[in-house]
């Protein structure tokens, strides 16, 4: 390694200009790291918190250290929490046996991209499954709804589009309608619009933005029609409601919706209502909520805590081999819908693993150009 830091700009530009196959390679590599975590939770050590100035009761600055130790990848993520400037930090990757530093990254882009990739692992598995076609895409249209307009929201939409572009969906898909729901600030769509040209004439992309006002807003219809829903808003009150998914007008045929929620990360936060979570407790077929970590989601996710979700109601992404335990049937009141619900709170394992994968992909990309 040279004496440089891999910047957020470098990471962003690499993934904005990579192929769909590179996205899939990164996703599968991240899935493997979560398998290692599920097999041995001890590779993720306890977080360490330290206030910068413990003599000052008014000081809001604290440091968070998140070490990862395994034979496959080792390193540490360090964040500084300043309530006035949000989180800033770094990710250091080392060789597990020698301790040699092999990569030092600014943390913002890696964090956002690894979260979006983790969100889409289950989606990729379901889209690419040839035995059980869950997605019907009525009238040749895939409806994707995203709550939020920030960095996380952008990467969720971008990666989902790249997966669809990879060809795993089939030739029947003609249109991807993306509906972005926001509170105050709209998303800049320049980068997403540039993807339209990559689809060619076979698939079109339509981009819409709606402000979240109330349940009767125009965006509510977008939610009810959705094949894919991403929740990327840190919010105390729910934005997604079970009754939106039970809307019998949403589909005349059986419909499947993949939902991933990543915005809430504290017990007081809620992205969806209690009624939706409770469906997984009452399901006779024992469908589970897909999570990155049982332990951490049950400590940090307000939605799961309020519904008293038990560990057996959850399945870790690292345990995901078949799809049957992640599909919940909502067929009631005339609604023909199944859903998969994924909840991500984030693990340092994901940061260190993706940082290491980035180094490998960048080296391979450089060699291919020579």
Curated annotation (Swiss-Prot):
InterPro entries: NAD(P)-bd_dom_sf, ODC_Mu_crystall, ODC_N. Keywords: Acetylation. One of its GO terms (cellular component) is cytoplasm. The keyword Transmembrane helix does not apply. The modification N-acetylmethionine is found at residue 1. Present with 172 molecules/cell in log phase SD medium. Belongs to the ornithine cyclodeaminase/mu-crystallin family. PANTHER family: KETIMINE REDUCTASE MU-CRYSTALLIN. This is Uncharacterized protein YGL159W. It comes from Saccharomyces cerevisiae (strain ATCC 204508 / S288c) (Baker's yeast). The lineage of its organism: Eukaryota, Fungi, Dikarya, Ascomycota, Saccharomycotina.
